[in-house]
Amino acid sequence: MSRAATTRMGLLEVRARRAVAGKGARLLRAKREVLASELWKLVHDVLEGRARLDEALHRAVKALELAKALEGEERLASLALPAARAVPLAVTVRRVWGVPTPSVAAPPLVRAADQRGSSPVSWGPSGAAAARHHEESLEVLLTIASKELHLARLGEEIQETSRRINALEQLVLPALRSEASRIAAALDERDREDAVRLRRFRARHPRPA
């Protein structure tokens, strides 16, 4: 930080910069509190979502194993090919205290039996159940993915905000306080010297009676 002029205007400038830096630190702390509150809500949601995903995947795997045993892998593979599809995803961005956080949305993924590319009668009950459970798992996964992206972005922003707060409180503000003290001390010393010179001048040049 460059030194300010050792003048009263310089002192006023440094004090103004210190006030701005202090206000900035307070605003950043308020921002961090809001982001942290949002983050903790998301942590709870993500943990719940992961538990739901574990359950959904467990059901899907069990259903697939049963379908393989009852209908055979080759038959399931032949049904899976026409059932394949691209899933259109919509990514939107919302802002929390100016922080862009992505959100992923998709249309309903669980399909009726006649929407999987084959005649419904081609699907046995176990194969249809396996397909449905996997589609349900994908829906849960996409929901969690959106929250995980949001969580990661908030975490990054909280870290960056903390670094900025630390820089202001540990570097900028102490430096400005020190600079203000230096200028104030120099001005006081200058005032004392001026007062001494004035007394000497008056002593040498007394006013005529």
Swiss-Prot record:
Molecular function GO labels: ATP binding; proton-transporting ATP synthase activity, rotational mechanism; proton-transporting ATPase activity, rotational mechanism
One biological process term in Gene Ontology: proton motive force-driven plasma membrane ATP synthesis
Highest taxon listed in the record's lineage: Bacteria
Keyword Ion transport: yes
Keywords, comma-separated and alphabetical: ATP synthesis, Hydrogen ion transport, Ion transport, Transport
Xref: Pfam families: ATP-synt_D (PF01813)
Keyword Cell wall biogenesis/degradation: no
Gene3D superfamilies: 1.10.287.3240
InterPro entries cross-referenced by the UniProt entry: V_ATPase_D
Record function comment: Produces ATP from ADP in the presence of a proton gradient across the membrane.
Family listed: Belongs to the V-ATPase D subunit family.
Full protein name: V-type ATP synthase subunit D
Primary gene name: atpD
